[in-house]
From Swiss-Prot:
Keywords: Cytoplasm, Developmental protein, Differentiation, DNA-binding, Methylation, Repeat, RNA-binding, Spermatogenesis
Taxonomic lineage from the root: Eukaryota, Metazoa, Chordata, Craniata, Vertebrata
Main location: cytoplasm
A GO biological process held by the record: cell differentiation
Protein name as catalogued: Spermatid perinuclear RNA-binding protein
Basic and acidic residues bias locations: 357-371, 466-476
Protein species of origin: Pongo abelii (Sumatran orangutan)
Asymmetric dimethylarginine: residues bearing it: R612, R617
UniProt biased composition (Low complexity): 477-497
Length: 672
């Protein structure tokens, strides 16, 4: 599965292609002017028809019986002869592209549309248009299409089709066979199928506005595919309503918004999977009451050709050649491929390219290997994000467990604005930002400012350093108070005072790590985890170490800090002040058994200068030194060897005699 970032190149190609097929602002303005003018003119035609019908009423029609008048009122309460005009097709869906700008309107009639009504509207429409604008339009009727065709006389050339229809046509077809139609159709009734298609187009436009317009990249992909249908004859049968259904189902079923390139690839994957082929799931028409296949008009050969073409396009896209599918030139890489200019000649004149930058480029200030790290750290410190992040962390330490709430989300999809709030001591603070995280950071800054805490980075560092000083002072007092009593209560108080609230490392007075310094004085110490408390946002660990029979505890936000706190407490108790000299002289030597124990004790006596050590006689133990070495305590005064330095050996180094074990004869075998 390709990662989300790998579709960035496809997105660039799709958006560039989309910009070339999208209508220009002049064309869109011409479309808007023409459609608005015709809609307003049809409204005036409807008013003129109503006035004409009222003027032709006879006096006898006004003297009908009350019951007949009630029936006529119930029949004529629909109102106007022309009920309204609605946009359908590309205008309503926003799918106009260059060289394919078919404009369509539906003129809804109260009664079934007839040829007489069509002629009446056609004759009066130019008169009403002249009252609205000075532009010239050509108006002609098309009885076979049940429509009126309107064309403009200047560039860009546009054609607008106004189709007449009525809801009564569909209601009549949906009646059961047992019901009789009381009214007879007029002889000059317009084509019934054309009127039904106009009603279906109206339903399609409403469905598209409700389902597909809100999907990210859906309209863009539809424009790209409509251009593909115009360029490639194989895709022409899919153009229109089936293509819109496929795109909506393909993109709408994804659990996240898709970019233009990934959305186009997803549509191609659906078509390449064989949904159009016989035996496949088909394509359900959601705008029909009865189960209807939207692909029923296509032949099997057409479906196979489209599937084959989609598979080929999918392969090209997988190999980074989507520009071939879009029939455009490949775009250059967004990142520069070469950072340095390569030299093509060397000193000897042979043609060779330098594939690496010259060594001199790396000299100067970049000699320090940590130069890049320092430069990046400086950039981070100069940014404002560190201030906001520190503010959020400090607020979480001061008031842990605060609940941030999302109040609102406004703005367009490409530039949203989130508003977050938090309740602190009954006061609600609000802030906005381009993301939820940024809005939370802004809220934290407001809360800290209201509480009187500094929010700058330098102020945070000063505050943290003061916390360290106060912690160290409290540690000294607590350790001195716990020296006489080593009970559970005292250790609890010690752990509470040894908590480290800063994120910096814990160091001794000499600038060393407490754990390392304590390990130098007492090796083999074991640290045990006593307790672990707090939630995920505020963990507290308590570590314990035993040194010379005394136990010391330390606490911190993690095990490392708690371990360092415990080691620091032990150092301050045992190796600082008057106890430092006594503890330094202590040497705990592990007891050994048997011959090795005797050798160790003898070596220690020799080092201390208490006389020449003696070795007990034991099996396989000899006092002779190995070649090149002199055993300490044998042949040299005071137990030091001639190879030792003039200033002597370290005080705590344990010197062992060299023991030579007899070697047994090893059999040698030779094979011939």
């Amino acid at each position: 599965m390709r990662s989300i970032r790998s579709f960035a190149n496809d997105d660039r190609h799709v958006m560039v292609k989309h910009s070339t097929i999208y209508p220009s602002p002049e064309e869109l303005e011409a479309v808007q002017n023409m459609v608005s003018t015709v809609e307003c003119a049809l409204k005036h035609v409807s008013d003129w028809l109503d006035e004409t019908n009222k003027g032709t009423k006879t006096e006898g029609e006004t003297e009908v019986k009350k019951d007949e008048a009630g029936e006529n009122y119930s029949k004529d309460q629909g109102g106007r002869t022309l009920c309204g005009v609605m946009r359908i097709g590309l205008v309503a869906k926003g799918l106009l592209i260059k060289d394919d700008m078919d404009l369509e309107l539906v003129l809804m009639c109260k009664d079934k549309p007839t040829e007489t009504l069509l002629n009446t509207v056609k004759d009066n429409l130019p008169i009403q248009i002249q009252k609205l604008t000075e532009e010239k339009y050509q108006v002609e009727q098309c009885v076979n299409e049940a429509s009126i065709i309107i064309r403009n006389t200047k560039e860009p050339t546009l054609t607008l089709k106004v189709i007449l229809t009525s809801p009564l046509i569909r209601d009549e077809l949906e009646k059961k066979d047992g019901e009789n139609v009381s009214m007879k159709d007029p002889p000059d009734l317009l084509d019934r199928q054309k009127c039904l298609n106009a009603l279906a187009s109206l339903r399609h436009a409403k469905w598209f506005q409700a389902r597909a317009n809100g999907l990210k990249s859906c309209v863009i992909v539809l424009r790209i595919l409509r251009d593909l249908c115009n360029r490639v004859p194989t895709w022409a049968p899919l153009k229109g309503w089936p293509l819109e259904l496929i795109c909506e189902k393909s993109i709408g079923t994804c659990n996240r918004p898709l970019g233009a390139g990934e959305a186009l690839r997803r549509v191609m994957e659906c078509l390449a999977s064989g949904i159009l082929l016989p035996g496949g799931p088909g394509l359900h028409d959601p705008c029909e009451r009865d189960p209807t296949d939207a692909l029923s008009y296509m032949t099997i050969q057409q479906k196979e050709d489209i599937t084959h073409s989609a598979q080929h396009a999918l392969r090209l896209s997988a190999f980074g050649q989507i520009y071939k599918v879009l029939e455009m030139d490949p775009l250059p890489s967004s990142k520069p491929f070469q950072k340095y200019s390569w030299s093509v000649t060397d000193k000897e004149g042979a043609g060779s390219s330098a594939l690496k930058r010259p060594f001199e480029d790396g000299l100067g200030d970049d000699k320090d290997p940590n130069k890049k790290m320092k430069r990046n750290l400086r950039k981070i410190l100069d940014s404002k994000a560190i201030d906001l992040m520190n503010a959020l962390m400090r607020l979480n330490q001061i008031r842990p467990g605060l609940q941030y709430k999302l109040l609102s989300q406004s703005g367009p999809v490409h530039a949203p604005v989130f508003t977050m709030s938090v309740d602190v001591d009954g006061t609600t603070y609000e802030a906005s930002g381009p993301s939820k995280k940024t809005a939370k950071l802004h809220v934290a800054v407001k809360v800290l400012q209201a509480m009187g805490y500094p929010t700058g980075f330098d102020a945070d560092i000063e505050c943290m350093s003061s916390d360290e000083k106060s912690d160290n002072e409290s540690k000294n007092e607590t350790v001195s108070s716990n020296s006489s009593n080593n009970t559970g209560n005292s250790t609890t108080e010690t752990s509470s005072t040894l908590e480290v609230r800063t994120q910096g490392p814990i160091l001794t007075a000499s600038g060393k790590n407490p754990v390392m310094e304590l390990n130098e004085k007492r090796r083999g110490l074991k640290y045990e985890l006593i307790s672990e408390t707090g939630g995920s946002h505020d963990k507290r660990f308590v570590m314990e170490v035993e040194v010379d029979g005394q136990k010391f505890r330390g606490a911190g936000p993690n095990k490392k800090v708690a371990k360092a706190s415990a080691a620091l407490a032990a150092l301050e108790k045992l190796f600082s002040g008057p106890n430092a000299a006594n503890n330094k002289k202590k040497k705990i030597i592990p007891q050994a058994k048997g011959v090795v124990n005797t050798a160790v004790s003898a070596a220690v006596q020799a080092v201390r200068g208490r006389g020449r050590g003696t070795l007990t006689r034991g099996a396989f133990v000899g006092a002779a030194a190995a070649p090149g070495y002199i055993a300490p305590g044998y042949g040299t005064p005071y137990g030091y060897s001639t190879a030792a330095p003039a200033y002597g050996l370290p005080k705590r180094m344990v010197l062992l005699p060299v023991m030579k074990f007899p070697t047994y004869p090893v059999p040698h075998y030779s094979f011939f």
